[in-house]
Structures are given as C-alpha cells and as structure tokens.
C-alpha cells in the first residue's frame, strides 16, 4: 500500500461525504462503484424488529441530486481504519451519521463498494 493509495482511499471517502453535503450527484456517482449497496439497520414500522434497509448506486446518486444531505451541518472526519492490498475500510463521522465504507481498487481507481451506516442519535 503506497502513500498515493492511502491518499486515494481518503479522497474516495471525502468525495462521498462532501458530495452528500453539497448535493453534487456527479461527484457522488464518480466515487461509488456501480454495484454499490448502502445499508442501515432500521426498526420495521409494523413489527418493530430490526431489518436491513438498502440503497443502490442509483438510489444514492438520486438522493444526492435531490439535496437530501444539503441541510446538514458541514463538519466531518474521515478515518482510514484498515487497508490490505486492494481493499480498505474507512469511517466517516459527520454531525448526523457514522458511515463505514468498504473501498476497493479497480485498476487505478479506488471506489466505494459498500456502506453500513447509522445515525449519530436515534430519532
């Protein structure tokens, strides 16, 4: 893992959160792998039991385009948690969410392939 790789991993994570906060759908689309799945654990509205809610690359780009993150405070912190050859895990702490990103190298690009997130505080 080179210093350039680490910088590229951090750039992918930074692009993700900054695109969300600014409504930049093109930037979001560029940092995500086309097969991305973004998941959260939500309580089912009927049963009250935990269930998995998932978004695709397309869902994420459209939510970004709609400005769903633009009303949030702009502060965030990106931490590279671990790296190994062609994969990495990063954590993004923002005012509202904690996101764990799995990032992988595809040829010379690092892209986010999966996200698991949860609100900082339950609503």
Regions found by a protein language model. Give the residues of each.
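Surface-exposed, charged secondary-structure patches
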Residues: 4-8, 37-97
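Residue-level "edge-of-site" marker
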Residues: 33, 41, 116-118
């Amino acid at each position: 893992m080179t210093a350039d790789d680490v910088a590229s991993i951090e750039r992918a994570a930074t692009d993700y959160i900054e695109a969300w906060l600014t409504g930049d759908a093109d930037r979001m689309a560029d940092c995500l792998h086309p097969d991305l799945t973004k998941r959260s654990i939500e309580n089912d509205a009927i049963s009250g039991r935990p269930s998995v809610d998932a978004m695709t690359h397309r869902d994420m780009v459209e939510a970004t385009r709609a400005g769903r993150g633009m009303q949030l405070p702009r502060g965030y912190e990106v931490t590279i948690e671990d790296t190994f050859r062609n994969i990495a895990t990063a954590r993004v702490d923002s005012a509202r969410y904690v996101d764990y990103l799995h990032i992988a190298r595809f040829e010379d690009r690092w892209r986010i392939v999966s996200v698991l997130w949860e609100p900082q505080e339950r609503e």
